[in-house]
Amino acid sequence: MEKWRIYSFQKEFERRCGLNSSLGPIETTGEDPNRKDTVKNIQSWEDCDNSSCSNVDHLFGVKDNENFISDDTFVVFDIENQIFEIDNDHSFLNEPFSSYSDRNSSYLTNVFTSEDPYYNRYMYDAQYSWNNHINGCIDSYLQSQICIDTTTVSGSDNDSYDIHGSVCDGESHNSSEGESSSRRTHTKGVDLTIRESSNENERESSNENERKSSNDLDRTKKYRDLWLQCENCYGLNYKKFLKSKMNICEQCGYHLKMSSSDRIELLIDPGTWDPMDEYMVSQDPIEFDSEGEQEQEQEQEQEEEETYKDRIDFYQTKTGLTEAVQTGIGQLNGIPVAIGVMDFHFLGGSMGSVVGEKITRLIEHATNNFLPLIIVCASGGARMQEGSLSLMQMAKISSALYEYQLNKRLFYVSILTSPTTGGVTASFGMLGDVIIVEPNAYVAFAGKRVIEQTLNQTVPEGSQEAEYLFEKGLFDLIVPRHLLKSVLSELFEFHALFPLNQNSNQVEC
C-alpha cells in the first residue's frame, strides 16, 4: 500500500490546468514549511524504507469550502489490488454536507447510502464522485508531466488505477541515490513492457490490414469482369455502360482503349459493313518456336511457356478476331469508304505478315474502286515473332499507299489512337493526307522504357502525348471520340465526296 500526500484545501482555489507556479515539477520536493510537523512518510513504489513526497496544489476550484478544510489528505494506491482511496484525518468525505459548488455546475450532492438496485454511485455517493474527480485531475497531471499516454494510464473503473509509465527524462525525485537508480531501473523495465505491448498492437493491426487487403483483393477478382479501371484517374467504370459512352471515363473524360468492333459500330452506318479477308490467319512463317531455338534459349522458354501459335489461338478465342486488324467496306453518313481498324487487344495490335497483307489488299481495293480510305491505328509496332517478315510489311503498305495517293490522287485519312508506336508510326500511320489523333493518345516510334534503357536518359513526361506533338506540327487535328464521325463526314464533303443518295455522280479529288 503506497500513499501520496496532497494538500488540497487551505483557501478558495481557482481552476488551474497544472501545478501552482510556486511549486516545481513532480520530481522536486516542495513541502510547506508550516506543515513540516505533520508530514508523513510516503513510501516509494519499490522500496518501503525510502520515502518520497510531492505536493499537488490548485487542481480545481471551490467556492464554498468551509466544510472541506483538511490538514492532511493522502492519495492511497494499492498497485497489487488496483485500489485508489483517499485517506483523510478528519474523514470529511464521510460526513454529510449541503452543497459543493464547482465553477461550472454543482458536482456533488448530499451523501446517503442506499440498497436500491438502481442506486447510482456517480449521483449519490460523494466519496465515489470525489475519488472520480481526483482521478481525473491526477490523470491529466501525469499525462502532462510524466508523458504517460491514456492507453498506459487507465483503470477498469474510475476508482481503481493501474499505472504503467515512465518519467520523460527517466528521473524521479527520491530521498536517496540508491532509490533513484532503483526507480530508473524500474522505469526501463516498464518502458520495455510498453514497447512490447505496442509491438503486439502493431502486429495485430498489420495482420488486420493484411486480412482486409486480402478480402479486397478477393472482391476485386470476383467483380473484375464487371468494372474497368481508368488508366488516367484510376476510377472504376461499369463495363456495361462503357459502350454507350464510347469507352470514355466517366470521372475524368480520358479516352480508354476501344475494340475494333466498337470502332466500326461508331464510324460505319448500321447494316453497311462488309468485311474483307476475315478468315486470313497467321501460320508462324519463320517457326519462331522451333526445337533448335528451344535448346539455345531454355531460360526464355521457362519465362514464356506459351508458343506463338498458342498465343494466337488464345487471343483469337479472347477477342473473337482472327488477327489484329479488321478491314472492309462500309458507309460513313452515306459516303462509301474503305476502312481498316487495328485492335490493340489482339497481341498488342502488333503488325505481322497477315496484318500487313490485309491492309495492303484494302488499299489496293480502294485504289481500284476509287474509294476514300480510313485506317485507325492502335499498335505496339512490328510483331517480333515474325522477324524480318513483319518489318517488310512497312515497305509493302507504304508502296501501296504511294500508288493510291500520288498516282490515283485519292484521299487517305489516318486516325491515331493510344497507343500507336513502332513500325506503324514509321509507315502508314504518319502518311495520311489528314492525320487525326485522339486526345491524350500515346504516339511514338520507340517507347519511353526503350529510350531510357538504350540512351540512359530520362524521357520528359508528356513528350510523347498527342497535345505536345500537335504543338510541334505532327498532327492536323485532335478530335474527341464523340465528334469523330461528323468531322470525317465534313472532310469528305470538303473533298467532293458526297453521299450516294445526294449525288450519284461523285467527283473524285
Curated annotation (Swiss-Prot):
Acetyl-CoA carboxylase is a heterohexamer composed of biotin carboxyl carrier protein, biotin carboxylase and 2 subunits each of ACCase subunit alpha and ACCase plastid-coded subunit beta (accD). One of its GO terms (molecular function) is zinc ion binding. The lineage of its organism: Eukaryota, Viridiplantae, Streptophyta, Embryophyta, Tracheophyta. InterPro entries: AcCoA_carboxyl_beta, Acetyl_CoA_COase_Trfase_b_su, ClpP/crotonase-like_dom_sf, COA_CT_N. The keyword Metal-binding applies. Zn(2+) binds at residues 230, 233, 249, 252. A zinc finger (C4-type) spans 230-252. GO terms for cellular component: acetyl-CoA carboxylase complex; chloroplast stroma. It is found in: Plastid, Chloroplast stroma. It comes from Ipomoea purpurea (Common morning glory). The gene is accD. This is Acetyl-coenzyme A carboxylase carboxyl transferase subunit beta, chloroplastic. Its cofactor is Zn(2+). Its main location: plastid. Belongs to the AccD/PCCB family. Keywords: ATP-binding, Chloroplast, Fatty acid biosynthesis, Fatty acid metabolism, Lipid biosynthesis, Lipid metabolism, Metal-binding, Nucleotide-binding, Plastid, Transferase, Zinc, Zinc-finger.
